[in-house]
């Protein structure tokens, strides 16, 4: 086992994000971490990577295991060049092996000016340089927080192929369902402070989570039925003198104290404004540029009610 987590808890102020979470990682495992926004996914990754300490429990990395971690917001210190940043901290032997790989990966991620200072990079370029760094360095475990951020479609497809072929262990958070579907073999969902694991990819996760929720609902229906029956008995005013009556009263109180399945957080988008007709946005001949560079020219578009349109294109082409 490369990495093990036992009964880990983590809180920020009065808010408990992780409560008694356990997790393991074997060689070759590829795990996707999912959950609603704010559930604690990135917190879990930081604990796995050693970037934060748990409030309780243990996180254990086997001796000699090398790990690389991509945070959501990488921070670069100093004025190193792009290539220096990617190879930072490597010994001579690892550096010579990693440099060719680093140049190849940077090119695939759209970063070709290796001698440029990292201080002059845009936010998207910094993310791609940080991603190249964790991919190029020799390691046994990759921990990636939103690795597809700031990647165009071709870059995402390349990264997908790269991670599918990679032989090490992988833990990642991503909101890209299809990326998860094609790469991971185990899903772990952070929910209400707990971690639920499911063998299989995203589609298998959906099936198995539905089965788990139905089992929870069935258990709750059974609990409610027993409570109703026991309530009727309690209302008859039994005495607690006898051992059996006392034990039954204790079981009733314990059953009543249990909580049923919590309401699950959901994302709900609700357009409240009324609209007349089907047309919502119309653009005619729109042109936009920055500093002499035209990114949109003579753009025509009509957006109708209920349209669903995806905007794709290379980085810097003008999508945003």
Where on the chain are the PLM-derived regions?
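ABC ATP-binding cassette signature C-motif
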Residues: 1-221, 265, 269-320
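Intracellular alpha-helical coupling/juxtamembrane segments of multi-pass membrane proteins
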Residues: 208-251, 255-262
